[in-house]
């Protein structure tokens, strides 16, 4: 049956509002730090895209330049070959061809695109893209003050948008220029161009001379198709650069420059080097620093201690008189003689502190109360840290380090699972149940009995051996993980 605790202090009245417990790993300061030196970060992706743009520009140069000899009369002579006796005239503006003269000439008029002009346009844009991509990459790698500012990424956005649009236009013009059938489609000269180029779209008879210049004019060669594809890929790369440049500016505004790391060597100047790197190798995400499990439930510490059968506050006798000296026997497994500590040396001159859990004194308290005499008994957690030294000694070789990493990964998974189960119990509003029981006017009502059942059931769970074992196991895993992490950190120094 429900019995209301005598020393009850509702958290809302004491603290001015409900205090909810934080779940495991509810806040990590490292998550607020943006690691912009990584290749997977927004600036890193911009660097990758700039490298790809430089490579694709070189590819466009090679592909387009390989077709230029067919558009240039280097020797000053005609580059045509006879295709038979007699002569033929296409009959459309600016185009003439003579078979009996062994000559060939082109003149473009109207709305037709000169292949030489289209190739010159795309070569010029490829040169601009090459320079811009190289400049962006160099500035991001050197990490100049300008390249770490919002103004730089604004310039990148504007320049990428302009150059990307021009490259898109140049690629379209080049596609039309190297494919005369496509640009003549729908015009009055489509029939004439098709009749001239149709001979190259069907199998050529043996022994028939082929005009190579006309062949390269009518047929889109493989290197020309590759240049077209590379042109569109450059446009896509500039679009990706614009997207991540906008994202970088937003992160700079959101987190501030003080929370952004542009160089890797600034991360662990005051800490352990390479610890975060090996933790990520054994877990999905970077393992945050392990912290003590928050033992208070949804309310004050008094609520939790009352629910576990521990007196919430010291009695009047304990307040008016010094706290009795406690002797904490240690386990024989550690091979140490039992020692004790005294918490009553200054009790007559100072207000008695709240009653602490046995076996877990703070070292700072010992230093203060004992006047620097710190040879008293160690806490249970300190003894537990010492016990891991024998099972996990300092690392001396790489193979041993890898074994420690694997052990860390398996134990970390179990620790998170147990922590999640404990957090589920912490979400149950114990203070609100107490308030409902205290405010209920009729103890025989159905609502009162329901709330009382919930309270008693929660109290039984928290006082059960299974719950205590989970808490003990969770704390043991935390100590073990901290020890393994420290050993690897010492080895990596």
Curated annotation (Swiss-Prot):
One of its GO terms (cellular component) is apical plasma membrane. Residues 386-493 form the OCEL domain. Residues 334-407 are annotated as: Disordered. It is found in: Cell membrane; Cell junction, Tight junction. GO terms for biological process: bicellular tight junction assembly. Residues 1-47, 142-151, 247-493 are cytoplasmic. Its main location: membrane. Disulfide bonds join 197-218. The modification Phosphoserine is found at residue 379. Localized at tight junctions of both epithelial and endothelial cells. Residues 379-389 have a biased composition (Acidic residues). The keyword Chloroplast does not apply. Probably plays a role in the formation and regulation of the tight junction (TJ) paracellular permeability barrier. Belongs to the ELL/occludin family. This is Occludin. It comes from Xenopus laevis (African clawed frog).
